[in-house]
């Protein structure tokens, strides 16, 4: 398991956006699809060699 602390990244983003109380919509860079077709998962998977 890998633990990544994103707090420094969020703090930098808030400072660069100059927003006093940011919401998730301010910090999200990519629009997430609510409805995803199961066949699209295969195109987004990255093979991991064993």
Swiss-Prot record:
Active site per UniProt: 40
Cofactor(s) listed in the protein's UniProt record: Mg(2+)
Residues bound to GTP: 28
EC code: 3.6.5.-
GO cellular component, one term: cytoplasm
Entry annotated with the keyword Hydrolase: yes
Keywords linked to the UniProt accession: Cytoplasm, Cytoskeleton, GTP-binding, Hydrolase, Microtubule, Nucleotide-binding
One term of GO molecular function: GTP binding
Localization in the cell: Cytoplasm, Cytoskeleton
Reactions listed under catalytic activity: GTP + H2O = GDP + phosphate + H(+)
Keyword GTP-binding annotated: yes
Coiled-coil segments on the chain, per record: none
One GO process term, biological-process aspect: microtubule-based process
EC class name: hydrolase
Subunit structure: Dimer of alpha and beta chains. A typical microtubule is a hollow water-filled tube with an outer diameter of 25 nm and an inner diameter of 15 nM. Alpha-beta heterodimers associate head-to-tail to form protofilaments running lengthwise along the microtubule wall with the beta-tubulin subunit facing the microtubule plus end conferring a structural polarity. Microtubules usually have 13 protofilaments but different protofilament numbers can be found in some organisms and specialized cells.
Recorded family membership: Belongs to the tubulin family.
Function comment: Tubulin is the major constituent of microtubules, a cylinder consisting of laterally associated linear protofilaments composed of alpha- and beta-tubulin heterodimers. Microtubules grow by the addition of GTP-tubulin dimers to the microtubule end, where a stabilizing cap forms. Below the cap, tubulin dimers are in GDP-bound state, owing to GTPase activity of alpha-tubulin.
Name this polypeptide is given: Tubulin alpha chain
Source species: Populus euphratica
């Amino acid at each position: 398991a890998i633990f990544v602390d994103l707090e420094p990244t969020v703090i930098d983003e808030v400072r660069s956006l100059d927003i006093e109380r940011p919401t998730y919509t301010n910090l999200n860079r990519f629009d997430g699809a609510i409805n995803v077709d199961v066949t699209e998962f295969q195109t987004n998977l990255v093979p991991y060699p064993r």
